[in-house]
């Protein structure tokens, strides 16, 4: 094992922590927690359930932020003590434990540093993710299903609850589309950098001649609407269609017309839901996602108007944001950040944190440059 200069490393940890602490504004965070705690303790809090939910959720988020900061500084202090004991007693086991903890704290600081970059209006929100198969036939449908598994595994690794809201199966294999929620703080801010067109290059398992196939899938990420958001859609602006839920291969999985498709007529926005048991539940879920999409659309339009004054009306990540090449070599590469990984199996198993972190930093740099 290479010799580690623990004194220098611990100084570096404290410097990184200090910069994060400054950005997080701990005193303001504590004041926010005190104010929210006072409001959460009011006897008439639940007279307005929607407002109460927002207050308690925000309080939980703020308390978690402060706890993460306090835990990290304690871990750095404990590491310093462990190193001193290990060096005084010339204990190889203690020094090995210290080396492992050093690496773990570095990772925790890196994760927290990325969270401090999530300062967008909706970044704290939970997320709704939709994956759609693009060009490439059955390979594109299979790719869409691979991406669904990748994001669900990513969420599982982080302990984030997920809810699959809708799945539309392709006839031969894979998915035409899938929609799911990630029910965790900052899920939208984190996953929004995954939005865009993903490209897969591989030898097609569905081609009898074993030819190489390029296929595409689109990923959409929107913030989950909260009950206190003012998004009212007049009934005459929504067209409602009902149909039977379908499973793999196009087979019907329900004998009643429980699936629901909502179309927002002014914008052409379409949302389908079929995973709930009743038409009423599917309609409520579809309406929630439709409201979320319209909320984001409104924000994007406002941002575009502001950017137009500065001569910048670009409002997308571009078409192809990441390539997954499985043949003739193995490489996953983000075309915006240039970050790349050769272990494609690990990526498809949900190990995408480095891609997300690089994407968030790239987005922050672009925003700062624009300002």
Swiss-Prot record:
GO cellular component, alphabetical, reads: cytoplasm
Gene label: prfB
Claim: Cytoplasm is one of the keywords in the record: yes
Q: Which Pfam family name is an example for this entry? A: RF-1
Q: Which family does the record claim for this protein?
A: Belongs to the prokaryotic/mitochondrial release factor family.
Record organism? Arthrobacter sp. (strain FB24)
Compartments it resides in: Cytoplasm
The entry's keywords: Cytoplasm, Methylation, Protein biosynthesis
Q: Which GO terms describe its molecular function?
A: translation release factor activity, codon specific
Residues with N5-methylglutamine modification: 251
Which pairs of Cys residues are joined through disulfide bonds in the record?
none
- Could you tell me which PROSITE patterns the record lists for this protein? RF_PROK_I
Q: Which PANTHER family match?
A: CLASS I PEPTIDE CHAIN RELEASE FACTOR, PEPTIDE CHAIN RELEASE FACTOR 2
Q: Which InterPro entries match?
A: PCRF, Pep_chain_release_fac_I, Pep_chain_release_fac_I_sf, PrfB
By what name is this protein known? Answer: Peptide chain release factor 2
Highest taxon, organism lineage: Bacteria
The role this protein plays is:
Peptide chain release factor 2 directs the termination of translation in response to the peptide chain termination codons UGA and UAA.
Q: Where would you say this protein principally sits, based on its record?
A: cytoplasm
What is the recorded post-translational modification?
Answer: Methylated by PrmC. Methylation increases the termination efficiency of RF2.
């Amino acid at each position: 094992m290479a010799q580690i200069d623990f004194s220098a490393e611990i100084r570096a940890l404290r410097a990184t922590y200090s910069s994060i602490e400054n950005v997080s504004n701990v005193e303001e965070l504590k004041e926010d927690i005190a104010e929210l705690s006072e409001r959460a303790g009011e006897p008439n809090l639940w007279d307005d359930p929607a407002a109460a939910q927002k207050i308690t959720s925000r309080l939980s988020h703020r308390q978690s932020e402060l706890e993460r900061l306090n835990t990290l500084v304690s871990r750095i202090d404990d590491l310093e003590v462990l190193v001193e004991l290990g060096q005084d007693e010339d204990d190889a086991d203690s020094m090995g434990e210290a080396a492992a903890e050093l690496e773990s704290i570095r990772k925790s600081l890196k994760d927290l540093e990325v969270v401090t970059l999530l300062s967008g209006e909706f970044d704290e929100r939970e997320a709704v993710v939709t994956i759609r198969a693009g060009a490439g036939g059955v390979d594109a449908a299979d790719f869409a299903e691979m991406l669904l598994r990748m994001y669900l595994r990513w969420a599982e690794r982080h302990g984030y609850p997920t809810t699959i809201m809708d799945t539309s199966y392709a006839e031969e294999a894979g998915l035409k589309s899938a929609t799911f929620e990630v029910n965790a703080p900052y899920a939208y801010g984190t996953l929004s950098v995954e939005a865009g067109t993903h490209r897969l290059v591989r030898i097609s398992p569905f081609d009898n001649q074993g030819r190489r196939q390029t296929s595409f899938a689109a990923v959409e990420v929107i913030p989950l609407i909260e009950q206190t958001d003012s998004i009212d859609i007049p009934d005459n602006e929504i067209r409602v269609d009902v149909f039977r839920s379908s499973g793999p291969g196009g087979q019907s999985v329900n004998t009643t017309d429980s699936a629901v498709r909502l179309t927002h007529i002014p914008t052409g926005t379409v949302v389908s839901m079929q995973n709930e048991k009743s038409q009423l539940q599917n309609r409520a879920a579809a309406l929630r996602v439709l409201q979320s999409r319209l909320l984001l659309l409104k924000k994007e339009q406002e941002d575009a108007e502001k950017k137009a004054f500065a001569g910048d009306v670009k409002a997308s990540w571009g078409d192809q944001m990441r390539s997954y090449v499985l043949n003739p070599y193995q490489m996953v590469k983000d075309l915006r950040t240039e970050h790349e990984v050769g272990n494609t199996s690990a990526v498809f198993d949900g190990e995408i944190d480095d891609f997300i972190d690089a994407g968030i930093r790239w987005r922050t740099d672009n925003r700062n440059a624009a300002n």
